[in-house]
């Protein structure tokens, strides 16, 4: 092992005291782990990536979720309002008077 360490910038046997050449060979005999799919996918399947930025897509989704509740509440108020209260906008009655003056 001294020949192996010759020429290195630092030579200290205690740095390599736990090194065993036999352990390296045993590790290389192990078979690598392999992914085995559980489902068959058609070979014609086309993977398409979205053009929009991931961050922008996320922000749009969050905005839609946030505003969906507000929109639902607004629609509910409008439905209830139609049944009990008069409409918010009322036709102007003085518009004819203004036209007659000119």
Swiss-Prot record:
This is DET1- and DDB1-associated protein 1. Component of numerous DCX (DDB1-CUL4-X-box) E3 ubiquitin-protein ligase complexes which consist of a core of DDB1, cullin-4 (CUL4A or CUL4B), DDA1 and RBX1. Keywords: Ubl conjugation pathway. The keyword Flavoprotein does not apply. Residues 67-102 are annotated as: Disordered. The gene is DDA1. Pfam families: DDA1 (PF10172). Functions as a component of numerous distinct DCX (DDB1-CUL4-X-box) E3 ubiquitin-protein ligase complexes which mediate the ubiquitination and subsequent proteasomal degradation of target proteins. In the DCX complexes, acts as a scaffolding subunit required to stabilize the complex. GO terms for biological process: positive regulation of proteasomal ubiquitin-dependent protein catabolic process; protein polyubiquitination. One of its GO terms (cellular component) is Cul4-RING E3 ubiquitin ligase complex. Belongs to the DDA1 family. Signal peptide: none annotated. The keyword GTP-binding does not apply. InterPro entries: DDA1-like (IPR033575), DDA1_dom (IPR018276). Pathway: Protein modification; protein ubiquitination. It comes from the Eukaryota. Coiled coil: none annotated.
């Amino acid at each position: 092992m001294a020949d192996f360490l010759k020429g290195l910038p630092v030579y200290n046997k205690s740095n390599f005291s736990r090194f065993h050449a036999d352990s390296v060979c045993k590790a290389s005999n192990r078979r690598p782990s392999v992914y085995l799919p559980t489902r068959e996918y058609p070979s014609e399947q086309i993977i398409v990536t979205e053009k929009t930025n991931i961050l922008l897509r996320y922000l749009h989704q969050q905005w839609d979720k946030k505003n969906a509740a507000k929109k639902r509440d607004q629609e509910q108020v409008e439905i209830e309002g139609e049944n009990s209260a008069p409409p918010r906008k009322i036709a102007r009655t003085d518009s004819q008077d203004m036209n007659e003056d000119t």
